[in-house]
Amino acid sequence: MQSKRDCELWCERVNPENKAALEAWVRETGIRLVQVNGQRKYGGPPPGWVGSPPPAGSEVFIGRLPQDVYEHQLIPLFQRVGRLYEFRLMMTFSGLNRGFAYARYSSRRGAQAAIATLHNHPLRPSCPLLVCRSTEKCELSVDGLPPNLTRSALLLALQPLGPGLQEARLLPSPGPAPGQIALLKFSSHRAAAMAKKALVEGQSHLCGEQVAVEWLKPDLKQRLRQQLVGPFLRSPQPEGSQLALARDKLGFQGARATLQLLCQRMKLGSPVFLTKCLGIGPAGWHRFWYQVVIPGHPVPFSGLIWVVLTLDGRDGHEVAKDAVSVRLLQALSESGANLLWSAGAEAGTMVKQ
């Protein structure tokens, strides 16, 4: 087994010419490069920067890099087209780059100029660069939260993460156990990365629970969006007068009745509920599969929901239908309609939203 010193000596022997050229360039220019979590970074902000960070859309992705290329060749090239706010070169343990980097400009115009000028630029013979718009990761998923956690309690627990948090949503966890998943949206990739680091270094405990903190994956985001909103994102929206009339007529009659009247006003027909109990979890939570068929809509609305049954002996399927109605009304509200029904099920029913 190699010792630590053996590994260091091996790394020093990898690409020594370019490493020496980089060190000479750093000494001559006085530029400061910082190694952080597998990447070497310049700026963020650069010397003399005043004001807020650049807006979203000001960063480009740089691919197809030869692995022995360093900042002394890349930063001057990308500074030709605009002022750099930050440059990040992804690094391996051996000191070679990982084949890609990110350049963030002071404005979107700089990023557009880099794409127009440097995409397919021949850094070396038969080695054209790939330069395209960077899609910044600004969203995290936090899975494993308690079923009864409220959004206000979650926001209170997230306060130490700083002012970069822009949006927090609580949704039913896609996992098999009762629980919730939080989707957190931040103002920038840096703010999201700092929050992720803080949560992970805190042994991934939040609200007293062991949670899984990850970058929000596109497939998970799509699955949760379909579960929450489903086909109603494409549904015609009722007029404001119809919504007001539904609210005035129903008062506190119940979420299912509200949904029924709303569908009538939208000329969609009466919703038909199908439910199936899939099992019972801890603390009396019941997991239901549901499907709601609305005659005037081509696609049914389906998903999973957890409910706790009331003590008045109501049938579990009826409780689940009420809870599903609340979810559908909230989905309609979030997709553009006014809120018809306050968040929560009928009196005495606990619902995992």
From Swiss-Prot:
Function recorded in the entry: RNA-binding factor that positively regulates gene expression by prohibiting miRNA-mediated gene suppression. Relieves miRNA repression in germline cells. Prohibits the function of several miRNAs by blocking the accessibility of target mRNAs. Sequence-specific RNA-binding factor that binds specifically to U-rich regions (URRs) in the 3' untranslated region (3'-UTR) of several mRNAs. Does not bind to miRNAs. May play a role during primordial germ cell (PGC) survival. However, does not seem to be essential for PGC migration.
Entry-linked CDD domains: DSRM_DND1 (cd20313), RRM1_DND1 (cd12487), RRM2_DND1 (cd12493)
Source species: Homo sapiens (Human)
Quaternary data: Interacts with APOBEC3.
Gene Ontology molecular function: mRNA 3'-UTR binding; mRNA binding
Protein name: Dead end protein homolog 1
Gene name as annotated: DND1
An example Gene Ontology CC term for this record: cytosol
Domain RRM: 58-136, 140-213
Protein's GO biological process: 3'-UTR-mediated mRNA destabilization; germ cell development; mRNA stabilization; negative regulation of miRNA-mediated gene silencing; spermatogenesis
Keywords: Cytoplasm, Developmental protein, Nucleus, Repeat, RNA-binding
Location in or out of the cell: Nucleus; Cytoplasm
